UniProtKB/Swiss-Prot annotation:
Keywords: Glycoprotein, Neurogenesis, Repeat, Secreted, Signal. Gene3D superfamilies: Immunoglobulins. The gene is ndnf. It is found in: Secreted. Disulfide bonds: none annotated. Its main location: secreted. This is Protein NDNF. It comes from the Eukaryota. Residues 1-19 form the signal peptide. Secretory protein that plays a role in various cellular processes. Acts as a chemorepellent acting on gonadotropin-releasing hormone (GnRH) expressing neurons regulating their migration to the hypothalamus. Also promotes neuron migration, growth and survival as well as neurite outgrowth and is involved in the development of the olfactory system. May also act through the regulation of growth factors activity and downstream signaling. Also regulates extracellular matrix assembly and cell adhesiveness. GO terms for biological process: cellular response to fibroblast growth factor stimulus; extracellular matrix organization; gonadotrophin-releasing hormone neuronal migration to the hypothalamus; negative regulation of neuron apoptotic process; neuron migration; positive regulation of cell-substrate adhesion; positive regulation of neuron projection development. InterPro entries: FN3_dom (IPR003961), FN3_sf (IPR036116), Ig-like_fold (IPR013783), NDNF (IPR019326), NDNF_C (IPR045805), NDNF_Fn(III)_1 (IPR055271), NDNF_N (IPR056225).
Amino acid sequence: MKLCPWYIALILLPVCLQSQKLPTRDEELFQMQIRDKALFHDSSVIPDGAEISGYLFRDNPKRYFFVVEEDNTPLSVIVTPCDAPLEWKLTLQELPEEASGEGSGEPEPLEEQKQQIVNEEGTELFSYKGNDVEYFVSSSSPSGLYQLELISTEKDTHFKVYATTTPESDQPYPELPYDPRVDVTSLGRTTVTLAWKPTPTSSVMKQPIQYCVVINKEHNFKSICAVEAKMNADDAFMMVPKPGIDFNPFDFAHFGFQSDNNAGKDRNFMPKASSSKLLRQITTKPKVDIQKVCIGNKNIFTVSDLKPDTQYYFDVFAVNAATNMSTAYVGTFARTKEEAKQKTVELKDGKVTDVFIKRKGTKFLRFSPVSSHQKVTFSVHSCLDAIQIQVRRDGKLLLSHSVEGVRQFQLRGKPKAKYLIRLKGSKKGASMLKILATSKFNKQPFPSLPEDTRIKAFDKLRTCSSVTVAWLGTQERNKFCVYKKEVDDDYTEEHKKREQNQCLGPDTRKKTEKVLCKYFHSQNIHKAVTTETIKGLQPGKSYMLDVYVMGHGGHSVKYQSKIVKTRKFC
């Protein structure tokens, strides 16, 4: 048999009277009670002066009760919707007489009390529908049994309720200043500076206050409860159990919820396909694009790492650190500034151009070939880390590649064509490169390179005064120059990386570091290997060896540096 809510209220009535001291409250007893979570967990009783959290299933109303014993009692009720709009109403029902009509002093039977309340509808004091934090405040409320009924018609949702009969002394929510707006004081491409007036709760009432700033791209929020619900929306741990999947339908029917007749009858029955589908829904749900930052008691904050030309919504919440209850300022929104339009560099046919790109930066180049109907060749020499190159012709993307070292791209020509080159730098640091665009195939300033530009050292051929190394060549006859430099034994890969600018040629080296230069090529690409013994070294010393290959146009490319060490004892 399903219990009537009024019947539940009468059963809970002694608990209400015992757990609440209305209108006067025993503070020591109250503090002990609100610390006892078991007392208020999943209870229909609203404790006086404490905020409770609840959960609503869609279209299933929930009712809460509290008793005011004396007339002319101040009353304040605050309802905070979280992730969905709520409909709620507050009604007043007069308390039944405790004594029977004969004046025997014996209480009326429970069934008669229940019938007396059910027959009387009660008086509706307030109702609201929406997602705002809404208040019911009365300076003089009559005695009686108060019922708060809440329902969510949109979806399952969280909510919070706070009620007190001493609103003048109980001020757990921070008070807003006379101007509760959040102002944008500075706006950049990736930063926004916000400012707001401090809450009087901190300056006047000397209560511990901290501010939390929330940033997102969708809309402003009216409560931290709504923010946290949004942030936890993709968390499988927060998912509400569903009838027929997590529980037997009987479990829900027992508690007054409608069950799905098509749900599995076995508590543990769940088809594997459904299970894997549910798991995919949980694991593939995208992360919510929202950020919450608590900044202490400062009332100025700069939000950084934003995207240019993007609209963001900003909310500020004052949080009472003693009660962990919060109040929302009037949020704002702003669009970050656009990226500064970069100057497009014009490439000259057959001329090498040096390009510098900031970390994560982008550069645009334009090329109008002299002979537009001829094939067009782009030669790129990335000096440091890999860079990204995209080439478009008349708006159409022709190529998109990552370039490390030297790469060459050849495109079919088109009359009166114009090319737009987009270069994107490395995430690790600044990028440097040399680029040549030409419609004249014989204009190739960079030498051809093998796929592997490492230098190999032969450990067994090491002596106290020499090392033997080898490197790959190509079918094209090129000039190779070898340089050596003594380094400390603790010379690390990080040191080597700082000197790995492949665009620096032999002209930047000391004459004393030069070992030799020689020409080399092989018609058989599989045999294009050359070896060299570096002599005149000191025993037990470390050296950095570099090999430069010289191009016909005078531009050189450096192979990957190699650290070698001579034997200490021979």
